[in-house]
Amino acid sequence: MKRSVDARQRELKVHLTVLTDDEGRPIPKDAPIPLYEPPVFQDVHNANRKAIIIGAGPAGLFAALTLIEHGIQPIIYERGKEVSERKKDIALLNRNEGLNPESNYCFGEGGAGTFSDGKLFSRSKKRGNMQRVMELFHYFGAPDTVLYEAHAHIGSDKLPGIIKRMRECILEHGGEIHFESRIDSLRELKVESLKFKDSPIILAIGHSAHDTYRMLAAEGVALETKGFAMGVRIEHPQSLINKLMYRGLTSNSSPKGKESNLIDFVGNASYSLVTQVDGRGVYSFCMCPGGHIVPAGSAAKSCVVNGMSASHRNSPYANSGMVVQINPEDIPGDDPLRGLLFQEELERLAFEHGKAPYIAPAQRMKDFVEGKESKDLPACSFLPGIIPSRLDQWLPAHIGKRLQQGFRDFDRKHPGFLTNEAVILGVESRSSSAVRIVRDPETMESVSTPGLYPCGEGAGYAGGITSSALDGIHAALQVITSQPLL
């Protein structure tokens, strides 16, 4: 069962895939037919087999749930706080009252996606049973729409409660979760306790765990640079995006008219844009209709932005990352962490061009393309605040010039997209991991470190909540089928 909206033409179309009986008649919604087979979790309090999981993001949580289904006790170490305490630290950051480097938009229970929109969508068609991921989210409280919407979305206001219920399930069935427990050495973890000595480790860190990458490199774990993307986050008035994407229809100009009814039915418009500039992709990333821009850094003296939407997606702003593809050969050297170092360099540069502590540098979109100073800035959803800055001058040329041409290309496709009503903020640098923890393609085990199973976005094998969750499931299944190390 699937529902998708095609708004490419003036006549909007809704595509439905429905479940029917043998004679082709749609099955009623209230028919006594289960939507899916619910999970069956075992009691693992006294399980003989244990597995350590580092990270309580989607990869780590779904790995833990899978282990419990198969009678293995998961022991999770999470550097950040549980979700309700994490929410308090994020509120302080939004008010410009300080950054907790261990509890923020990147670190803590649920991972980065918990407070950055909650999209349940993956572009990949080759990763496996995504539907099972959706079913588990639904089992723990996600709305029915996650089972059939083509671009399912939970929202940053709803996802924390779902994550909490996952945690409660893990603990109820005998798993362990240790918060505020950053792992600073794999070697020390393996010898910390006899009960852990022979346990496999599922490494499910997020892409912002730069200190963990450095620890892994120092301990001889095989790493390599991978392609990633960096750029800016852009924000338009949502009413303008509705007009452009719904072919001339507007959102709230007539509360009782067809435009308002349309938005009520299909929601605020989103977009997915891509072009090629000088051999590199330029594209929108994590588009958040009716959303907000948020401070997504995890280190002092750095400025990182991201986007999020609540479940109703009803703010007056539409934001999206606008990023440029960066290949390993674009960064000189052979250090596997050189992409990470480039990220950090640009984040520090954005901080220097903003205003301490976390006010972001910003420029009107058309001024950026035309190389002009923005004398003032439009209203913006970024709570810490924005300050005028010449992003066109200080962004690296291979990023800035491609973004300028990319914006022109997008305006040709959607006339009116390039406008000074829109504002760009720097920098969007955490769209994906710049490092890959090298693993065997069949067993998912580290090629250098027996018993280590890297997975998820931080390992460089996923991008987003659903693909990370599925990779965590796959890693757990590999642990389950492997012979226990005795």
Where are these regions (language model features)?
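Residues forming the flavin
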Residues: 1-115, 119-486
